[in-house]
A protein has these predicted regions:
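The catalytic Tyr-centered alpha-helix of NAD(P)H-dependent dehydrogenases
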Residues: 69-76, 100, 110, 114-118, ...
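Short, glycine/charged-enriched secondary-structure capping and boundary segments
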Residues: 16-20, 58-62, 111-114, 146-148, ...
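C-terminal substrate-binding subdomain of Rossmann-fold SDR/epimerase-dehydratase oxidoreductases
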Residues: 126-262
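N-terminal Rossmann-like NAD(P)+-binding domain of SDR-like oxidoreductases, especially those catalyzing
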Residues: 1-101, 239, 245, 250, ...
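Hydrophobic alpha-helix immediately C-terminal to the catalytic Tyr-X-X-X-Lys motif of short-chain
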Residues: 79, 83, 87, 117, ...
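Short beta-strand segments
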Residues: 45-48, 97-105, 135, 166-171
Length: 262
């Protein structure tokens, strides 16, 4: 069995590191699929992304909606999904595509300023910095604590009913970005207010249906946002005070957001 989670998941940065994005998120994935065919892997579980839905549809996004990516990161995920379908039809590689979205929790990378909004805020609050929000904060997401994903991902490789299926995986309660930021500030007890930055190219309202994941993967949303962020904050306070990762040189500077300019 192969679980393919590896990716550089900085979706917002992907338009400015296009080659790096495709080398890491597409080419390496197709190499792994080729090896899986060659060595008769019994199941290939691919962690895709809700980003493949783009901004064409009104949420919640369901698995039967046609992919409509709006950035190179989502294009790479979509291409891998298509390659898996071909590998199944032509070579018999059994696969399951899981489209997780907005998972967070302990051991998450909080030192990368380009991805994982809750981790970004957590780093800022640990360092007594105001949390930053792109745009007006009215964007909507549904967050899930990482522990809630463990059993569903295991079942994705174990159940025959999951072969050849695409399954959303993620939270059942939506939050605006402003609300999520305030929940974290309250959890930390910090007397800091968010700072709003220029809006960026993104899908503003994005969350998915979850019924199929309950039926096929036994998904249960057990940890609410406040409880999950409390656990993550206690973990984060024990971590070393590391420098944040800064991308050394963008492949494309045209249109880069002021906040990311080196």
């Amino acid at each position: 069995i192969v679980y393919h989670f590896a990716a550089y998941a900085a979706e917002g940065l992907s338009p400015f590191i296009r080659k790096y994005n495709y080398d890491n998120n597409l080419i390496t994935s197709t190499n792994l699929i080729t090896c899986s065919i060659q060595y008769n892997v019994s199941r290939f579980v691919f962690a895709s992304s809700m980003s493949v839905y783009g901004d064409k549809y009104k949420p919640p996004f369901s698995e039967d909606m046609k992919q409509a990516p709006i950035d190179p990161y989502a294009v790479a995920k979509y291409a891998v999904e298509m390659d898996l379908e071909i590998a199944f039809k032509q070579h018999g590689l059994n696969y399951t595509i899981v489209r997780p979205h907005n998972f967070y929790g302990i051991n998450q990378n909080i030192w990368d300023k380009y991805r994982n909004v809750l981790g970004i805020w957590m780093y800022q609050l640990l360092n007594k910095q105001n949390p930053t929000i792109f745009g007006d904060g009215s964007q909507v997401r549904a967050f899930s604590y990482v522990d809630d994903s463990v059993l569903p991902f295991w079942n994705a490789s174990q159940k025959n009913s999951c072969i050849g299926e695409i399954i959303n995986l993620g939270g059942i309660k939506e939050h605006t970005i402003n609300d999520a930021c305030n929940v974290l500030i309250n959890v930390t007890g910090q007397n800091l207010k968010p700072v709003h930055l220029e809006a960026r190219h993104e899908t503003k309202y994005a969350w998915s249906t979850w019924e199929k994941s309950v039926k096929l993967l036994d998904f249960k949303h057990q940890v609410d946002l406040e409880e999950g962020l409390s656990k993550m904050w206690e973990w984060a306070k024990k971590q070393p005070n590391r420098e944040r990762f800064i991308w050394p040189k963008y492949e494309l500077n045209k249109g880069i957001y002021d906040y990311w300019k080196n």
